Curated annotation (Swiss-Prot):
This is Uncharacterized 12.4 kDa protein in mobB-Gp55 intergenic region. It comes from the Viruses.
């Protein structure tokens, strides 16, 4: 009966050490991926910004899909569409706020 708590403690320690090793390995791989692709990701980020400002969905879609491929993040057409709509909405809100500010002056 006294062996069960000791076994449970050992199992918990083993599981936590494995989880910690996995976390460190995942962090190392993520840092390596980001450092390797830093310039390309920055280029794609700027490309997406310019495309959104110019109301060019095709270029925006290209930049988002390519960056998500590099980062190994899943995406689908619905997600890209939602990102586009929210981005365009934010840009339009900024333009409207600036226009109201100028008209109030």
């Amino acid at each position: 009966m006294t062996d069960k708590p000791e076994i449970n403690d050992e199992v918990e320690k083993l599981i936590s050490s494995i989880e910690e090793k996995n976390r460190l390995e995942a962090e190392r791989k993520a840092n390596k991926l980001l450092s390797k692709n830093k310039r390309e990701l920055n280029r794609l980020y700027k490309h997406a910004q310019i495309a959104a400002e110019n109301n060019n969905f095709a270029q925006y879609e290209y930049a988002i899909k390519k960056s998500r491929d590099i980062l190994k993040q899943p995406y689908n057409d619905e997600l890209i569409s939602i990102l586009w709509k929210t981005t365009r909405s934010q840009i339009e809100d900024m333009i409207d706020a600036y226009t109201r500010k100028i008209q109030a002056s």
